[in-house]
């Protein structure tokens, strides 16, 4: 991202994070920090809460980003669009009380954009895995779609692929998906 002819490098992707960074930049400049100091902060910031959190171990890489609504899902799918090379997705949808019982919002998300990506497989999981599978079929996503209701097992299956893993949980599936990624990438969180 370039602001006033100064290029800032960030470890987190996504248009929404660029807007957050721009807001942070504005406040930090107002407080008197210079561009070099702000750059150090941007370069060293990492997330550990399942929001644009990256993992790497050997040649395997992954990213997890929470999606609780169409806007969050679209943002996560857009990050996948920006990644070069093959990808494997693991997408989880639960309908527990904390998630909200109504999962019809997935029909407002733009899953059709997956058709333009180089995807080896999509693993769907959670209490509404079959609903995700149907949504992907309606979006005419022509890649293998694997249903694994157990979130831990579904997330672990992504390690069978050498391609980049894009993990997208909703609220109550975040903890088990993040726990499994931490196990799989032991010592490889970035």
Each model region followed by its residue ranges:
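Residue-level signal for inorganic ion chemistry
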Residues: 20, 24, 122, 167
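Adenine nucleotide phosphate-binding catalytic loops in nucleotide-utilizing enzymes
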Residues: 1-73
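Glycine-rich phosphate-binding loop signature in dinucleotide/nucleotide-binding domains
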Residues: 31-34, 82-86, 158-163
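Alpha-helical scaffold segments in soluble metabolic enzymes
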Residues: 23-26, 75, 79, 157, ...
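Generic beta-sheet signal
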Residues: 61-62, 87-91, 163-169
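Generic C-terminus detector
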Residues: 130-138, 143-190
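Active-site beta-alpha connecting loops in nucleotide-dependent enzymes
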Residues: 66-147, 188
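Short, surface-exposed connector motifs at secondary-structure boundaries
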Residues: 6, 58-60, 113-119, 140-141, ...
């Amino acid at each position: 991202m370039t602001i006033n002819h100064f290029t800032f490098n960030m470890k987190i992707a996504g248009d929404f994070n660029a807007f957050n960074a721009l807001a942070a930049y504005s406040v930090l400049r107002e407080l008197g920090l210079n561009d070099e100091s702000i750059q150090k902060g941007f370069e060293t910031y990492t997330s550990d809460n399942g929001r644009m959190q990256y993992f790497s171990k050997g040649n395997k890489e992954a990213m997890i980003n929470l999606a609780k609504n169409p806007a969050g899902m679209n943002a996560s799918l857009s990050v996948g669009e920006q990644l070069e090379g093959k990808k494997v997705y693991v997408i989880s949808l639960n309908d527990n009380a904390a998630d909200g019982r109504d999962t019809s919002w997935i029909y407002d998300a733009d899953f059709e954009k997956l058709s333009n990506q180089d995807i080896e497989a999509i693993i769907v999981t959670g209490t509404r895995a079959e609903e995700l599978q149907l949504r992907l079929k309606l979006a005419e996503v022509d890649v293998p779609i694997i249903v694994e209701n157990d979130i831990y097992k579904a997330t672990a299956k992504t390690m069978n692929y050498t391609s980049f893993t894009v993990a997208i949980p909703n609220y109550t599936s975040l903890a088990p998906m993040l726990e499994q990624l931490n196990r799989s990438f032991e010592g490889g969180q970035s």
